[in-house]
């Protein structure tokens, strides 16, 4: 504890975190994720932390996607054999980690897309707090009731280490959960103005369609 406090107090800008600090950050973030999952009734045995190598740089800037990252993601998908995969398609993420994670998932999917069980698997991309899909691109719109929107907000708030001053491309000073909630409400309002049913909020998804029979995605 004393060594960690000393390191943090003397750390210089851009300096790599020590192994102890990286471990502490991992424990904090995994604990927050478990708390959020428990809140929305996700069973502990269904929570997996991949600890992808590209992320373990010890600095804000993460590494490039590597073969080991793709293999880890592919192994989990092959183990679970899901009917649906939900992946962050938020390419405006200031740190770029969502883009690398998306690339890892798509590269893994591209390598196993011709497996028989994958024919029944659908891949849905969602946006975070920074932007929303154009309405003509949306392929699945999930209505949220006021209570469901509160549940989403509360689950986001379980990630306490991420609540203040989340980076954003621009001068928007709203907190992450506020931007997310406003985005969901704005999507619902847009559907309402188009003459469709009115809801408190809507979560929108775009489907990723793998092209079967050939390898298109160049993995590391």
Located regions from the model:
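A conserved mid-domain beta-alpha-beta active-site/ligand-binding segment of alpha/beta enzyme cores
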Residues: 139-185
């Amino acid at each position: 504890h004393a060594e960690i406090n000393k390191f943090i107090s003397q750390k210089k800008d851009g300096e790599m975190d020590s192994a102890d600090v990286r471990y502490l950050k991992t424990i904090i973030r995994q604990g927050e994720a478990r708390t959020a999952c428990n809140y929305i009734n996700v069973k502990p045995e269904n929570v997996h932390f991949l600890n992808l190598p590209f992320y373990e740089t010890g600095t804000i800037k993460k590494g490039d996607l590597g073969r080991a990252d793709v293999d880890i993601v592919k192994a989990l998908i092959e183990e679970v054999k899901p009917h649906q995969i939900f992946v962050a398609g938020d390419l405006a993420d200031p740190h770029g980690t969502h883009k690398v994670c998306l690339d890892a998932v798509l590269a893994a999917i591209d390598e196993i897309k011709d497996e028989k069980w994958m024919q029944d698997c659908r891949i849905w991309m969602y946006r975070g707090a920074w932007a929303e899909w154009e309405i003509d691109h949306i392929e699945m719109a999930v209505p949220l009731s006021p209570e469901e929107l509160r549940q989403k907000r509360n689950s986001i708030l379980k990630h306490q280490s991420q609540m203040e001053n989340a980076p954003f491309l621009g001068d928007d000073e709203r907190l992450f959960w506020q931007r997310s909630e406003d985005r969901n409400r704005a999507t619902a309002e847009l559907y309402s103005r188009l003459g469709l049913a009115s809801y408190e909020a809507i979560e929108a998804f775009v489907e990723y369609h793998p092209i079967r029979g050939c390898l298109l995605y160049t993995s590391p």
